[in-house]
Curated annotation (Swiss-Prot):
Homodimer. Its EC number is 2.3.1.47. Pfam families: Aminotran_1_2. The keyword Transferase applies. GO terms for molecular function: 8-amino-7-oxononanoate synthase activity; pyridoxal phosphate binding. Belongs to the class-II pyridoxal-phosphate-dependent aminotransferase family. BioF subfamily. Substrate binds at R23, H135, T350. Catalyzes the decarboxylative condensation of pimeloyl-[acyl-carrier protein] and L-alanine to produce 8-amino-7-oxononanoate (AON), [acyl-carrier protein], and carbon dioxide. One of its GO terms (biological process) is biotin biosynthetic process. It is an enzyme of class 2 (transferase). Keywords: Biotin biosynthesis, Pyridoxal phosphate, Transferase. It catalyses: 6-carboxyhexanoyl-[ACP] + L-alanine + H(+) = (8S)-8-amino-7-oxononanoate + holo-[ACP] + CO2. This is 8-amino-7-oxononanoate synthase.
Amino acid sequence: MTQAFNERIAQALKQRREQGLSRQSEVIFSGNQTVLEHQGKRYLNFSANDYLGLANDQSLVRAWQQGLSLYGCGSGASPLVTGYTPAHSNLAASLCDWLGYESATLFGSGFSANQALLFALLEKGDLLVQDKLNHASLIEAGLLSPATMKRFKHNDLKALDTILNRSDCPSLVVTEGVFSMDGDCSPLAEMHALTQRHSASLMVDDAHGVGVLGEEGRGSCALASVKPDFLVVTFGKAFGLSGAALLTDKSSGDFLAQFARHHVYSTALPPAQAFALTHAVEMIRTQQWRRDKLNELQTLFAEYLGEHDSFVATQTPIKPWLIGETQQAVMVAQRCREQGIWLTAIRPPTVPQNTARLRITLSANHTKEQMHTLAQVLLTVTGEH
């Protein structure tokens, strides 16, 4: 490597360390369960996104095993060559039937699905309007796209209206259904009406809403009784697996098959995974008890901790515990681990400056006893117990 690149890398890492923002992966066993192991110690896990408790569900494990016996391991090619199997087709059909769309284009990740649409659809002269707290995949794609990107204050419909009022070019408004770091929901009904009034299109990334909210877990859009032009659902949260799909009308689906490079030039999802995902869709649709359990746990969380200054009320399993200062958040997370609770400090640039927090996530597999332990530890480490 050249000296210039070496120096650049060293300087960037040094700056992150000095800011207290350096990150690293830790080797975790059973990180998809409510009790994980790290370096021989066991912790209650309140950091995973396995909201419905499917990631280690034995029925889903068996479905993947059945898929392996039918299709083998990898897909062997991109979807437009030989990588699109009956398992992929069945998954797409299942998603369309469940969510009410004509087409479902599959991707290896939500990051890819988000970027694929923006890169394929937008041209110079278009207007892209995004919530300031949208996921990094969306913001990055907007910065790199030929369109003009404007960002509006989080969930501020008046600011969005002002931006759209000033434009007469093709416009795409992008938001998240549930925001991953705050756990709050977008005002989708009002936003949908606003985009229709301005003849703008609407894209919703519902990674953290689908499976959790709405009838049969159809997500935040169904809960708000709206149908966006483009709906992204990801499989790494409530589905307990990985990957993503972009739901559209048939014409847009045909367009993506031609021009969405993340889809065209990537190896298709393993067919066994697609087979298991179809089973996950059925579980999500029919096992309402998982969402009922989550609602019970959310009520408990509010009862135990609702009076604390760090508490933030949400209608989702994402429960931010606001700290503010970065080093303080890291210290509180470490003290929680010393008490047997695995929580992760979320720091800038993932969240805005001075809003560092613990991102607490609930799973349908958590017990009431585990919730009580979490509350006791949080109150203890913050000196209010």
